[in-house]
């Protein structure tokens, strides 16, 4: 669908989980995944923006060959916005006010990224 629609960017939003034997208490944070180099800047920027604006822990920014990061028509990233298996993060994930803040921060971050990465328009005069 991303290849067909050719959007300016593609962002897939998720909440993370761990295997049953994972460390639910000590694993937390926002993560971003990218595959093609054209998406690395977007992944790092939005990860850092959300961590800072929402005062959330960082899980990191990673290169990974995920289906939703492979399209080449646009910078395509996958964001993991927290760990559902972590009790404290689950409370944050399911809090309506936190969801609203997250949505606004994501929209603001995308807007700011576009502002910083706009291609100059050629002057044909």
Regions found by a protein language model. Give the residues of each.
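Active-site-proximal helix/loop segments of hydrolytic enzymes
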Residues: 1-125
């Amino acid at each position: 669908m991303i290849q067909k629609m050719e959007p300016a960017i593609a962002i897939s939003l998720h909440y993370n989980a761990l295997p049953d034997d994972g460390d639910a208490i000590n694993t937390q944070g926002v993560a971003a995944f990218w595959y093609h180099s054209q998406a690395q800047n977007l992944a790092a920027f939005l990860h850092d923006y959300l961590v800072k604006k929402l005062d959330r822990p960082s899980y990191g920014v990673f290169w990974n060959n995920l289906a939703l990061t492979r399209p080449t028509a646009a910078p395509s990233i996958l964001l993991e916005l927290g760990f559902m298996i972590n009790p404290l993060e689950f409370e944050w994930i399911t809090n309506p006010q936190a969801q609203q803040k997250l949505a606004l921060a994501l929209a603001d971050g995308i807007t700011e990224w576009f502002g910083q990465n706009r291609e100059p328009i050629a002057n044909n005069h």
